[in-house]
Regions:
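Intrinsically disordered, low-complexity repeat/linker tracts enriched for polar/charged residues
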Residues: 5, 9-10, 14-15, 19-20, ...
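Hard-cation-handling environments
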Residues: 379-478
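Short, Lys/Arg- and Gly-enriched loop/turn segments at beta-strand edges
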Residues: 100-103, 143-152
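OB-fold and OB-like beta-barrel modules that bind single-stranded nucleic acids
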Residues: 84-95, 131-144
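N-terminal accessory regions of nucleic-acid-interacting proteins
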Residues: 33, 40-41, 55-56, 61-63, ...
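OB-fold nucleic-acid-binding modules
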Residues: 36-88, 157, 161
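OB-fold (S1/OB) nucleic-acid-binding surfaces
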Residues: 94-122
Length: 575
């Protein structure tokens, strides 16, 4: 037998002790049968106790949830102060469009409009039950994307019953209150304008309501200097309202458009184009039908068919005109602003005066900005009250003349385009006077060159004490260059060229074209009456009228000489 080292004996003893401790610990963790029974009873008791304790708590939580107050509604015009916050808004869906990503609902309340993006998956329509015209309650987070406000939608509920009625009533009350313009004075004392002051207020209300309803406003105006002045005045008033109403930076290009009328009337060609565009926008972008504002157009039979087409689709319509109307045409507009409809026979009133006053009612903030426009709209003999207004605004007579001539020249080129920015620079940027003077100088040079060409070719004839200056526009004008026939005849008549060569106190200028005669007088020559008389005298010429006072007489090319003789005779007898 060997001898055991004391150190080794100590290690072995320690290992033995450790093993015994481990075995005892394992035994402690092995439950006995009695332990199992006791533990089961304890677990069952605990479970029962837990159930009895949980049910009242859950009920209490549910009751608390039910009694929790509803989230407060936020007004849309306050969202700029609540970026990154959770909000609830209520309003009307005024537009819905599907992008390659989310569905974007344009929601309007009584204060403003905002885009709300809802996403289920890329390109898939979210909340298909919600459409334009529905009233909704929407919860989401306000975000700023590309410097524009947008609500990221968490939940959207289409409102029905009392909830819908509450929101609809709230919005309608706000619309009625906000859309009606305040009592605004006219720009100046003018009897003819005062006669239609109520109509101007009504027209302003229609325009303001359209903006608040997110309904596009389309201004269609005659492509003359006067028409441009009136259309630009309305544009100047509406654009700030659109910017205030819509958060998107490009809203002014979607919700307002100004389109010149090349032919001067709102005929079927113009109406067909507009209706095609509006139906396409409604189908593709869920847009509301626009409000059409016809300026220096929409009063004569030439516009009847176009207005009737808009009426079929129930597109709202406003007409603003200073020209003599045909019977019944004004009834096709929701609001017609024309002093002749109220028995005021003022041929010296321009549509620019009406347009500037309408603009001041649509948006009182632009009153000073448009106060010089009435003076700009007169080619000669502008009323003193309007020249005084222009002087007060810093526009002297030379400046207003330059503006008028510059706009007349630009109206001729690209006549179907609105030229928004250029017209704005000319009419409203006072510091850019040199631009107006430069373009106005071009106007005068081109006009004088053409007058030098045509004056030797003017013919003068008389009938029944009336002198006629006749220009064969087919033979002696550059028909496709500036100035157009209308501008040229206006200047010939203002200067009374040829009048000295004929006897008679009455003077009429005629532009004798291939198949029509344009009339310029003191406003007393009604083309419809003249056409009716001339048709009896030249029954094979196919004579008809286009327009009313100082309008045009149309005829067959092969009977142009007979038509001219008949028209001269008819006018002279009427005067």
């Amino acid at each position: 037998a060997g001898t055991v080292d004391p150190a080794e004996q100590q290690v072995d003893d320690q290992q033995t002790d450790d093993q015994q401790a481990d075995d005892q610990q394992a035994d402690d963790h092995q439950p006995s049968e009695s332990d199992d029974t006791a533990e089961g009873q304890q677990d069952a008791g605990s479970e029962t106790a837990t159930e009895s304790e949980t049910d009242p708590e859950e009920t209490a939580d549910a009751d608390a949830d039910e009694s929790e107050p509803e989230r407060a509604r936020a007004q849309i015009d306050s969202l700029s102060d609540r970026v990154d916050e959770q909000v609830r808004i209520e309003g009307e869906i005024v537009g819905a469009r599907q992008t390659s990503g989310p569905t974007v609902f344009e929601v309007r309340d009584e204060t403003a409009t905002v885009d709300c993006a809802a996403f289920v998956e890329a390109g898939v329509r979210a909340y298909p039950e919600a459409e334009t015209g529905d009233y909704v309650r929407l919860d989401g987070v306000v975000e700023l994307r590309n410097n524009e406000l947008q609500v990221e939608t968490d939940e959207l509920e289409k409102l029905e019953g009392d909830d819908r009625e509450t929101v609809e009533t709230r919005l309608e009350a706000a619309l009625t209150s906000e859309a009606r313009p305040d009592d605004v004075d006219l720009l100046a004392d003018h009897e003819s304008v005062a006669a239609v002051h109520g109509r101007i207020r009504d027209a302003a209300e229609e325009i303001r309501r359209a903006v608040m309803e997110s309904r596009p406003v389309i201004v269609r105006h005659n492509a003359t200097a006067d028409g441009y002045v009136a259309g630009a005045a309305i544009e100047r008033a509406v654009l700030p309202l659109v910017r205030d109403e819509h958060a998107k930076s490009d809203a002014e290009y979607h919700f307002f458009d100004r389109r010149p009328l090349e032919g001067g009337d709102y005929d079927m060609a113009d109406a067909t184009k507009d209706v095609t565009t509006m139906l396409d926008n409604r189908e593709r972008h869920d847009e509301k039908l626009p409000l059409f504002v016809l300026v220096a157009a929409g009063s004569t039979d030439e516009s009847r068919d176009g207005l009737e087409l808009l009426d079929i689709y129930d597109a709202p319509r406003v007409t603003v005109d200073a020209g003599y109307p045909d019977d019944g045409v004004a009834d096709l507009a929701d609001v017609a602003v024309n002093p002749h409809l109220d028995g005021t026979d003022d041929d010296d009133l321009t549509v620019g005066v009406l347009g500037a006053n309408l603009a001041a009612h649509v948006n009182a903030d632009v009153r000073e900005e448009v106060s010089h426009l009435p003076a700009v709209s007169y080619w000669d003999d502008a009323p003193e009250e309007y020249t005084d207004l222009a002087d007060d605004a810093g526009y002297d007579a030379d400046h207003t003349t330059a503006l008028r001539e510059a706009v007349a020249l630009e109206a001729f080129y690209q006549s179907y385009e609105d030229k928004r920015e250029l017209i704005t620079d000319l009419l409203f940027e006072h510091e850019k006077r040199d631009l107006a003077e430069h373009v106005g100088e071009q106007f005068r040079e081109k006009l004088e060159t053409e007058l030098d060409t045509v004056e030797p070719n003017l013919s003068v004839r008389g009938a029944n004490g009336v002198s006629f200056t006749v220009l064969d526009t087919e033979a002696f004008t550059h028909r496709f260059d500036f100035p157009p026939t209308g501008v040229l005849l206006d200047e010939i008549h203002r200067r009374e060229l040829g009048a000295d060569g004929a006897s008679g106190d009455e003077h009429v200028t005629l532009g004798f074209g291939e198949d029509e005669i344009h009339v310029r007088s003191d406003g007393r020559v009604n083309a419809r009456e003249v056409a009716a008389d001339a048709a009896d005298a030249a029954d094979e010429a196919g004579i008809s009228a286009k327009g009313t006072r100082d309008g045009a007489i149309e005829y067959l090319t092969g009977e142009r000489d007979a038509a001219l003789d008949a028209v001269v005779e008819a006018i002279s007898k009427r005067l």
